[in-house]
Amino acid sequence: MAMDYLAIGLSELGSISERRTYQLISGLRGLPEFLVADPGLNSGMMIPQYTAASIVSQNKQLCTPTSVDSIVSSNGQEDHVSMGANAATKLYKVVENTERILAIELLNATQAIAFRNAKSSDFIESILDIYRDWWDMANIDTFICFIH
């Protein structure tokens, strides 16, 4: 049951993250739609948000508690089976999915920050500098591939 609860909690974290990503690309926060300078010509961060939304839905599907499932096994010697291994397998996938959702939020957040002409704290700026060495702002549609 602990793994079921952890999966549900992580699923909720992913869902909240995707909603923040949606808020960034919605055009309602003083940022351009899809976080791209020319949203009519470029789709910007629309597809990463679609991806996050799809992963959130998969997490919801994976979060049906495994602990509610049991079947008699071992020729009737075990009348209640915890299905702990199945819960662990599903939890592992939810962890991977949530990592991807959070990475998509980070991608969108750094893109959004680039549209603001404001400086953050030295600590945040140092993190952004490291991140921007790896990924800079996308001004036009570009292929995004993260090797894991």
List each language-model region with its residue ranges.
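C-terminal auxiliary extensions adjacent to catalytic cores
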Residues: 1-148
